[in-house]
Amino acid sequence: MRHVLALAATALFLSAAAGGEAKAPPLKVCLVAACEEYHSDVSLGEFRKHLESNYNVACTTVSGKDAGKGIPGIEAIRDGDVMLLFARRITLTDEQLKCVQAYCKAGKPIVGVRTASHAFQNWLAFDKEVLGGNYQGHYGDGPKADVRIADRAKDHPILAGFKPFASAYSLYKNTGLAGDAQVLLTGTAGGKTEPVAWTRLHNGGRIFYTSLGGPDDFKDAGFRRMLARALFWATSRPVEGR
């Protein structure tokens, strides 16, 4: 009997070794698209295809209208590993607001894009309290923003493979970030320089935010790679390809 058990154990070991280590379950990403101004539904729809084709992720998408009332299905964030938020001036219902605030209070991971700094009209403090930002409007249309890696940020894992590029969208005013924010990228346009991507912790949870995110930004391979890596970084998981 012992001989049989030993043979079975050996067979299992050899089988596992031959097949390699078991793959981790897919990272569950909840994409919240509610910014018509920057066509977040289109950008995140294409980004979802990119993620699911190239990384070990499984996505859920919920959508709302720009400056609208509520985001149907936003409760799905409870079941995800990380929320990617791209919304603009949404007035959440009372129950939806409680859901989002509970998510944040629990210190769950967030990746915020562009208008996420003013995502919720009935929770304006979300920007400072959670994202660590200080959105004060933007400089308006004009010259393209020269996006570069910030000093002392070149070795950050989110930026692996990132190359400077020019963003065609208005530069957000965000000087005066939270004290624990680590600036990863800066943008310069018309002689003005602002932080355009940073990380921080909120209630122990990892936060990444970028004020970039116009439709053409999502076409940049480096920008897409940065966002994908931010999702894994926020959940403290190594980047896992398909």
Spans of features found by a protein language model:
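Extracellular ligand-binding/catalytic regions of CAZymes and related secreted enzymes
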Residues: 22-27, 53-54, 63, 75, ...
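Bacterial N-terminal signal peptides
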Residues: 6-15
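Extracytoplasmic/secreted envelope proteins and their assembly/folding machinery
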Residues: 41-44, 48, 97-101, 123, ...
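Short alpha-beta junction capping motif
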Residues: 30-35, 76-123, 204
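Solvent-exposed loop/turn segments at secondary-structure junctions
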Residues: 35-38, 65-68, 88-92, 110, ...
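Aromatic-Pro/Gly-enriched surface loop or interdomain linker
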Residues: 21-80, 238-239
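An acidic, glycine-rich "communication" segment
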Residues: 25, 44, 113-191, 241-242
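Positively charged n-region of N-terminal signal peptides that target proteins for export
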Residues: 1-4
